[in-house]
From Swiss-Prot:
Enzyme nomenclature, EC number: 2.4.2.18
Taxonomic lineage: Archaea, Thermoproteota, Thermoprotei, Thermoproteales, Thermoproteaceae
PANTHER family, sorted: ANTHRANILATE PHOSPHORIBOSYLTRANSFERASE
Subunit structure: Homodimer.
Sites where the protein binds Mg(2+) 2: D224, E225
The protein's name in its UniProt record: Anthranilate phosphoribosyltransferase
InterPro entries: Anthranilate_Pribosyl_Tfrase, Glycosyl_Trfase_fam3, Glycosyl_Trfase_fam3_N_dom, Glycosyl_Trfase_fam3_N_dom_sf, Nuc_phospho_transferase
Underlying gene: trpD
Catalytic activity reported: N-(5-phospho-beta-D-ribosyl)anthranilate + diphosphate = 5-phospho-alpha-D-ribose 1-diphosphate + anthranilate
Cofactor descriptive note: Binds 2 magnesium ions per monomer.
Family: Belongs to the anthranilate phosphoribosyltransferase family.
Record organism: Pyrobaculum aerophilum (strain ATCC 51768 / DSM 7523 / JCM 9630 / CIP 104966 / NBRC 100827 / IM2)
Top-level division of the source organism's lineage: Archaea
Length: 333
C-alpha cells in the first residue's frame, strides 16, 4: 500500500487497521518516510487517539525489527507506559525482582526515563547490573537465575531512526505505548501499567489481538502501577477477552499506605532497595502489591491475595534482595 495514501488517511482524521499500521511503522523505521512525514503521522494519531488496531500493528512491526531473546522457558514481563509524573520509585522493576525470587521467570524489558525522573534501566544500572548483556546470555539468566533485564535501545536498534523526531515532539507518541508490549522475548504473560485511563481499553484490546495468554493492564489513581493509596482499575485479558474490575489494597490483605516517592535518583534507588530489604514499610507494601499481580500473571499463585502474601513474605525473608544481588552478579559474568 502507498505510504502517502496512509498519511492522507491519517490527515483526514481516520484510523488505520492493523495491517496499515504495520506498513506505516515499517516505513518509519526503515527511513522511507521523511522526518516531516513521521512527525505528521505521529501527531495525527496522537490528536485523534491511537487505536488498539494501530498499536497492535506497530507492535507486530517492532517485534520483527527487534533483536530476539531465545527464551527456553515461559517468562513474564512487568512494564509501564510511564509519563504519570507522580515521582514514585520504580515499582515495576522492584516487583519483577520479587516475583523472580518467589518463583516466576522474568524477562524485564525497559529503558531509561524519557520524561520522568527514573526509569527501569536507570535503577538497574545504579545497582550495578550490566545493561549490555546479549540475547543468549539474557535467555540463560532467565532460565538459571529466574531474572534478566534487557535494555530496550540494545534490543530495538531500529527505534533510533525515529528518536530525533520523538525528542522534538512535545508529547508522548504511539511508540511510548508500543514499547511495553514489544518485549524481545515475545512473552505472552505480562503486567502492564498505564498512565492514562483511555489506554486501559487500547492496550488490553491490543494485547488480546496480539495473542497474549494472560495480561493484566492497570491504572492506579493517576499512576501506571497498582496503587496502595486507593483503587486500581484492572483490565484482565485472557483467551482474547478482557474483564474489567477495581481492586483496593484491602482486597489483597494489604494496608493503605502512601506510595513511596522520591525527589532524586539517589533517593529513588535508596527507597527501592530499602523496600526490597523490608526496611521501609510503605515501599515494601507497594512493591508487594505490584508483585502480587506479576505472580498471578505468571501462574505462580491462583489469585492476587495469595500473590501479595507470597510477595511480602519473600521480601521479609530477605529473598528479594538476594535475588537482585544474584541477578546483578550474574549479569557481569
Amino acid at each position: 500500500m502507498d505510504l502517502r495514501a496512509l498519511l492522507r488517511k491519517l490527515g483526514h482524521g481516520q484510523s488505520l487497521n492493523a495491517d496499515e499500521a504495520y506498513i506505516l511503522g515499517k516505513g518509519i523505521l526503515t527511513g522511507t518516510l521523511s522526518e516531516v512525514e513521521i512527525a505528521a503521522s505521529l501527531t495525527a494519531m496522537k490528536v485523534r487517539g491511537e487505536t488498539a488496531e494501530e498499536v497492535a500493528g506497530f507492535v507486530k512491526m517492532a517485534r520483527e525489527f527487534a533483536v530476539r531473546v531465545p527464551l527456553t522457558v515461559e517468562a513474564i514481563d512487568t512494564a509501564g507506559t510511564g509519563g504519570d509524573g507522580a515521582g514514585t520509585i520504580n515499582l515495576s522493576t522492584a516487583a519483577a525482582i520479587v516475583a523472580a525470587a518467589a518463583g516466576a521467570k522474568v524477562l524485564k524489558h525497559g529503558n531509561r526515563s524519557a520524561s520522568g525522573m527514573f526509569g527501569s534501566a536507570d535503577f538497574m544500572e545504579a545497582v550495578g547490573y550490566n545493561l549490555e548483556i546479549g540475547p543468549e546470555r539474557a535467555a540463560r539468566l532467565v532460565e538459571e537465575v529466574g531474572f534478566a533485564f534487557v535494555f530496550a535501545p540494545k534490543y530495538h536498534p531500529a527505534f533510533a531512526r525515529v528518536a530525533p523526531v520523538r525528542r522534538q515532539l512535545p508529547f508522548r507518541t504511539v511508540f511510548n505505548i508500543v514499547g511495553p508490549l514489544a518485549n524481545p522475548g515475545l512473552v505472552k504473560r505480562q503486567l502492564i501499567g498505564v498512565a492514562e485511563t483511555r489506554l486501559l481499553d487500547v492496550i488490553s484490546e491490543a494485547a488480546a489481538r496480539l495473542g497474549f495468554e494472560h495480561a493484566v493492564v492497570v491504572h492506579g489513581s493517576g499512576v501506571d502501577e497498582v496503587t496502595t493509596e486507593g483503587e486500581t482499575v484492572v483490565y484482565e485479558v485472557r483467551k482474547g477477552a478482557a474483564e474489567r474490575y477495581t481492586i483496593s489494597p484491602g482486597d489483597l490483605g494489604a494496608p493503605r499506605v502512601p506510595l513511596p516517592r522520591a525527589s532524586s535518583k539517589e533517593e529513588a534507588v535508596a527507597k527501592a532497595l530499602a523496600g526490597l530489604r523490608g526496611e521501609l514499610l510503605e515501599a515494601s507494601i507497594a512493591i508487594a502489591v505490584n508483585a502480587a499481580f506479576a505472580l498471578y500473571v505468571a501462574g505462580v499463585v491462583k489469585d492476587v491475595k495469595d500473590g501479595y502474601e507470597l510477595a511480602i513474605n519473600t521480601i521479609r525473608e530477605g529473598a528479594a534482595y538476594r535475588k537482585l544481588m544474584e541477578a546483578v552478579e550474574s549479569s557481569k559474568t
